[in-house]
Design a protein with these regions (language model features):
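Conserved catalytic cores of phosphodiester-cleaving nucleases, focusing on short active-site segments
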Residues: 67, 80-102, 115
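Short conserved micro-motifs at the rims of enzyme active sites and ligand-binding pockets
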Residues: 30-32, 95, 107-108
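Accessory DNA-binding and partner-docking regions appended to nucleic-acid-acting proteins
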Residues: 75-77, 109-114, 127
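Switch/connector loops and helix/strand junctions flanking conserved nucleotide-binding motifs
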Residues: 91, 104-106, 141-145
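Domain-level recognition of nuclease-like catalytic cores that cleave nucleotide substrates
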Residues: 124-145
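Accessory nucleic acid-recognition modules appended to NTPase machines
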Residues: 1-79
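Mg2+/Mn2+-dependent nuclease catalytic core
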Residues: 101-121
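Hydrophobic, Leu/Ile/Phe/Ala-enriched alpha-helical segments that form helix-helix packing faces
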Residues: 63-67, 115-126
């Protein structure tokens, strides 16, 4: 699969990243295969950390799939997990940080402020005046009452 930063064209950018789309095959090549000879010597905590890192990328993919047109965005020292047309505002943009764990209210607020700071350094800022910032965490997986 070819990843492009949000708003970039295949024809005009060299900022292309290629990655395996299927999560199971990606797990094999990014997590298990590189460590196969040492896998049995890893502690449970080391294996859990590797699996957690993989699960976080799968969760980011899941979150991007929830919003039509959503992509990652990166430039220089700025990386945004999710950038998409805002479903609630046709002229706006949704910019979100994605975390594969449940966050407290304080953590969510701190991450939102950090996201806004990163947005201030982003060149997309000049093209989009109306932006909604959000933090998506594992709580979105809970069924709603």
């Amino acid at each position: 699969m070819r990843d492009l930063p949000f708003g970039e064209s295949v024809r005009s950018t060299k900022k292309t990243l290629c990655r395996i789309q299927d999560p199971t095959i990606r797990f094999w090549f990014r997590v298990y295969s590189p460590h196969r000879s040492r896998w049995t010597t890893f502690s449970v905590a080391e294996r859990q950390a590797l699996v957690h890192d993989h699960a976080s990328t799968v969760f980011e993919d899941y979150c991007r799939a929830r919003f039509p047109g959503a992509e990652r965005y990166w430039e220089g020292r700025v990386e945004l997990d999710l950038v998409a047309p805002d479903p609630d505002d046709p002229k706006g943009l949704l910019v979100a940080e994605v975390k594969w764990r449940q966050l407290s209210v304080v953590e969510r607020d701190a991450m939102r402020r950090n996201l806004e700071t990163r947005w201030e350094r982003c060149s997309l800022r000049a093209q989009y005046r109306r932006v909604r910032f959000d933090v998506l965490d594992a709580s979105i997986l809970r069924p709603r009452p």
